Structure formats: structure tokens, C-alpha cells
Design a protein with these regions (language model features):
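Winged helix-turn-helix DNA-binding recognition segment
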Residues: 44-100
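N-terminal start-of-chain detector that recognizes signal peptides
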Residues: 6-11, 63-64, 70-74, 127-129
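N-terminal leader/presequence segments that precede the conserved core
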Residues: 1-2, 79, 141
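Terminal low-complexity, poorly structured segments
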Residues: 25, 62, 69, 133-135
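Short, amphipathic alpha-helical interaction segments positioned at domain boundaries
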Residues: 105-141
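Positively charged, low-complexity terminal tracts
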Residues: 1-2, 101-103
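Short recognition helix of helix-turn-helix/winged-helix DNA-binding domains
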Residues: 1-58
Length: 141
């Protein structure tokens, strides 16, 4: 197997954005859920750790925003994205505004690695014969 490994340093804000984009892509979040995930991650980063970790996040909507801060979306849009995060196991309701976080998707570390493996699809013998006739498949014999 061949591997290409690159390391990039990012500031705190950019790191959270890159992390959110990688997780969103891996889990196939729609655009609204991606934006809400980013907002929830930002809120999680502000959550104080207790006993070395933070296992939940307060998501209280008031004053036209999340925790009173404008996040560039309406409450209805936020709730739609939150619904997808709940359905996909990113968070779980603890109370009306407090949510357990999935520790595999929320952390306060300083590094992350996303690995996507590509595998060559095997061809059937009929497909292989047709491709070989076209000179498009090298058969190992």
C-alpha cells in the first residue's frame, strides 16, 4: 500500500474549521448540518473541562443566536441541522438544551488525522476480457 502523509499547522479557528469539514465529509452531513456542527464545535470549545474532559455541551438559543451570539442562521435552520446531528449520533439529548457529545467526534486536542483509503475495484472475468480486448487492463499471469 502506498501512503502520502502531509502535516499542516493551523491556528485554533482554522483547525476547528478543518476538523469540522473533515468530519462533515466523512459522515455525509448536508450543508445545514455542517454549519450547525461548526457552531456546536465552537460552543464545545468554549465549554470548560471537568475532570480532564467535557462530555456535554449547552446549546441554548436566545437573543437571536446560540448562547446569545449570532451564528448566521435562524433558530429554525439551527434546529434542522441539530436534528441531523442527533440522528447521526453526533450528540444525544441530556436535557432540553444540554447534549451529550460523541467523544469520537468532539475533542479538545491539538491534532487530527483523516485517513481515506482507496481500493481498486475488482473486475469480473467478462469485464476483464472486454477491457483486455480494448487494451485497457493489464492481467497479471
Amino acid at each position: 500500500m502506498s501512503a502520502i502523509h502531509q502535516i499542516e499547522e493551523r491556528d485554533d479557528a482554522e483547525f476547528v474549521k478543518v476538523f469540522a469539514a473533515g468530519v462533515s465529509a466523512a459522515y455525509g452531513l448536508n450543508r445545514t448540518a455542517q454549519r450547525v456542527f461548526q457552531a456546536v464545535l465552537d460552543e464545545y470549545q468554549r465549554t470548560p473541562m471537568r475532570g480532564g474532559y467535557a462530555d456535554s455541551v449547552e446549546l441554548f438559543w436566545f437573543g437571536g443566536g446560540l448562547s446569545g451570539r449570532d451564528i448566521g442562521m435562524s433558530e429554525k435552520t439551527f434546529q434542522r441541522g441539530l436534528k441531523e446531528l442527533l440522528a447521526k449520533g453526533f450528540i444525544a439529548a441530556k436535557t432540553a438544551s444540554l447534549f451529550w457529545v460523541n467523544p469520537a467526534l468532539f475533542f479538545k486536542g491539538d491534532r487530527v488525522m483523516f485517513i481515506k483509503e482507496y481500493r481498486r475495484r475488482r473486475t469480473t472475468s467478462d469485464e476483464a476480457s472486454a477491457l483486455e480486448q480494448q487494451g485497457q487492463l493489464r492481467l497479471n499471469t
